[in-house]
């Protein structure tokens, strides 16, 4: 049996992270995002991921199974515009709130605990940086991701936003939860 683990990404992981994003968006999110958004994931996305990995304020984690990279997660401090309520008011704990910006597992590697391990390690990393709670934005129609975060104890906090993908509008719910997670699946 292969060993599954999570580690901090290195710049050399950028091409594999970009591949996972492309495959996952095409396989799991085509109906949500539309072809135009997926087509925009050109070769420059690898450079974007290399820059994200090197950025000192965030940590990119990768999930591996044996020799394969199967998923990734990005975590860091929540920017003010991400943590503010709809009126723009910041909560008292804004400076102690972490953001799970992206968490993707390639669909063929799903249901093996990779997402849970990624979220648990990202939450641990955020706690080590002083965060006390986390937030993440999830498409309202993405029932699989909403269920995943609910199992981790995260819930919608009433804040919504709408993103324009170029050919459709995507309504997202902001989820919030504690960072003392010990998830394995």
PLM regions and their residue ranges:
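Short glycine/proline-centered loop/turn elements that form peptide/ligand docking sites
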Residues: 119, 142-145, 164-168
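Conserved N-terminal entry element of GNAT/NAT acetyltransferase domains
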Residues: 1-15, 173, 178-185
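Short amphipathic helical patch at the helix-1/turn junction of helix-turn-helix
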Residues: 105, 139-140
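Structural motif
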Residues: 20, 129, 151-152
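Acetyl-CoA-dependent GNAT
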Residues: 8-11, 19-110, 116-121, 125, ...
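Conserved GNAT acetyl-CoA-binding A-motif
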Residues: 126-138
């Amino acid at each position: 049996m292969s060993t599954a683990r999570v580690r901090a990404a290195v710049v050399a992981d950028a091409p594999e992270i970009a591949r996972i994003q492309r495959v996952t968006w095409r396989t799991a999110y085509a109906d949500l995002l539309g072809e135009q958004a997926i087509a925009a994931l050109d070769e420059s996305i690898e450079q974007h991921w290399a820059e994200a990995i090197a950025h000192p304020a965030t940590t990119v984690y990768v999930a591996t199974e044996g020799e394969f990279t199967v998923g990734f997660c990005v975590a860091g401090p929540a920017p003010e515009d991400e943590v503010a309520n709809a009126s723009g008011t910041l909560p008292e704990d804004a400076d102690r709130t972490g953001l799970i910006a992206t968490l993707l597992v390639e669909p063929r590697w799903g249901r093996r605990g990779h997402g849970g391990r990624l979220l648990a390690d990202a939450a641990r990393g955020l706690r080590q940086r002083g965060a006390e709670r986390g937030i993440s934005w999830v498409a309202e129609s993405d029932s699989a991701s909403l269920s995943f975060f609910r199992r981790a104890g995260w819930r919608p906090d009433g804040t919504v936003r709408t993103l324009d993908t170029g050919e459709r509008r995507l309504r997202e719910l902001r989820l919030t939860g504690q960072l003392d997670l010990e998830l394995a699946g």
